[in-house]
C-alpha cells in the first residue's frame, strides 16, 4: 500500500500487519524492490491526487493491469511515449452497482468485516454532516456508515 496519511498508515499497520506500506515518494522504488519482475502485476489507483495516476502506471510491470477507481478533478493525460512498451491494460470505474446486493449480503453474513474501516456512523437525517466529514477528511475518517433508521 502506498499511503501518505500517517493516520491511515497507522491504521493499516494495526489492522493488517502483514501488508507492506510505503509513502508516495518511495513508492516506485519500493514496488521494484518487492517484486520479482519489474513492477506490480495489478495496481489499484484509488487516491485521485494530482500525481497518483502517473505513479500507478509507473509502478506497473509490463503487461500489468491498472485499475482506476479514483475520481479526478481534472482530465488525466496518457503520456503514450513514456508508456511505450509497457502494454498495460487500464480498467476504470467506480463500484459496480450490480454487485452491491452481494457485497451487502457478505457483510451481513460476517464474511467481510468492515468494522475497522467504518470510523464514523451517522443517521440518515445527518447525511449532510456525514458528507462534510468524509469530503474534508475530518476527525481521522476512513469510511462513513449511514443508518436508514
Language-model features: locations:
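Conserved acidic E/D residue at the C-terminus of a beta-strand in Rossmann-like folds
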Residues: 3, 70, 94
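Short glycine-/small-residue-rich Rossmann-like dinucleotide-binding loops
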Residues: 48, 70-71
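Short, well-ordered coil/turn elements that cap or connect secondary structure elements
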Residues: 15-16, 61, 85, 109, ...
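Glycine-centered, small-residue-biased loops immediately flanking beta-strands
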Residues: 64-65
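C-terminal hydrophobic helical "lid"/dimerization subdomain
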Residues: 4-6, 54, 58, 97, ...
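Adenosine-nucleotide cofactor-binding segment
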Residues: 1-53
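C-terminal substrate-binding/catalytic core of Rossmann-like NAD(P)-dependent dehydrogenases/reductases
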Residues: 28, 33, 37, 73-120, ...
Amino acid at each position: 500500500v502506498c499511503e501518505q496519511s500517517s493516520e491511515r498508515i497507522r491504521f493499516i499497520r494495526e489492522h493488517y500487519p502483514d501488508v507492506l506500506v510505503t509513502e508516495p515518494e518511495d513508492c516506485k522504488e519500493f514496488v521494484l524492490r518487492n517484486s520479482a519482475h519489474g513492477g506490480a502485476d495489478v495496481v489499484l489507483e484509488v487516491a485521485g491526487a494530482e500525481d497518483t495516476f502517473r505513479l500507478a502506471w509507473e509502478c506497473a510491470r509490463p503487461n500489468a493491469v491498472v485499475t482506476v477507481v479514483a475520481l479526478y478533478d481534472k482530465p488525466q493525460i496518457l503520456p503514450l511515449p513514456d508508456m511505450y512498451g509497457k502494454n498495460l491494460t487500464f480498467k476504470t470505474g467506480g463500484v459496480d452497482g450490480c454487485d452491491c446486493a452481494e457485497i451487502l449480503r457478505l457483510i451481513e453474513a460476517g464474511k467481510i468485516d468492515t468494522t475497522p474501516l467504518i470510523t464514523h456512523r451517522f443517521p440518515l437525517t445527518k447525511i449532510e454532516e456525514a458528507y462534510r466529514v468524509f469530503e474534508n477528511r475530518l476527525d481521522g475518517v476512513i469510511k462513513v456508515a449511514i443508518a436508514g433508521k
